[in-house]
Amino acid sequence: MAVAPARARSDYDYLIKLLLIGDSGVGKSCLLLRFSDDTFTTSFITTIGIDFKIRTVELDGKRIKLQIWDTAGQERFRTITTAYYRGAMGILLVYDVTDESSFNNIRNWMKNIEQHASDSVNKILVGNKADMDESKRAVPTSKGQALADEYGIKFFETSAKTNQNVEQVFLSIAKDIKQRLTESDTKAEPQGIKITKQDANKASSSSTNEKSACCSYV
């Protein structure tokens, strides 16, 4: 079950953890850097293990702190990656539109999600490097959309190089997660517990400690 977002900090209302997964070389790190720092580099360095960036955005008047984890795509690092599935509230499955094998492997990554992530985790399919010449494209847009439809998830084609749809894909999944969490909170509200005045005092004194603890999965 997804961990509830921390809301006790002064600089944000929600803390949402996102995970970027996909084969090595599909551009996960480039997407992350473009979204977090608005930078792009042609020099490619393979991610070793796990790295993350943070960016705070505003959605519907709420400050959303996005903690975005970039994972290594190599087989030998998948055991490291699986430990980070559990706390993820949203997962971006990334493939390279010029590399058909990276697209075909999305099904394997989806199996990993089903095995290790929360049942309620939000997912989105991302076809990266959409700026490449059509002669180099190996995966048609229609094929990506068909796979997304099969899984019942949203689909975007992006380019970290030109910044095509990068902002949109991250904000889209963040908005869907916020909506899910808000609906979950609303449903939980009627399930109150009657407490005595003594219990209330105890709860009040302990709430500060609880609120100061950020998400345990960070």
Swiss-Prot record:
Keyword Metal-binding: no
Residue interval(s) of motif Effector region: 44-52
Compositional bias segments (type: Polar residues): 201-211
SUPFAM superfamilies hit by this protein: P-loop containing nucleoside triphosphate hydrolases
Annotated spans, Disordered: 182-218
Membrane topology, as annotated: Lipid-anchor
Keywords: Cell membrane, Golgi apparatus, GTP-binding, Lipoprotein, Membrane, Nucleotide-binding, Prenylation, Protein transport, Transport
Listed PANTHER family: LD44762P
Protein family according to the UniProt entry: Belongs to the small GTPase superfamily. Rab family.
Protein purpose: Involved in membrane trafficking from the Golgi to the plasma membrane.
Protein name: Ras-related protein RABE1e
Taxonomic source organism: Arabidopsis thaliana
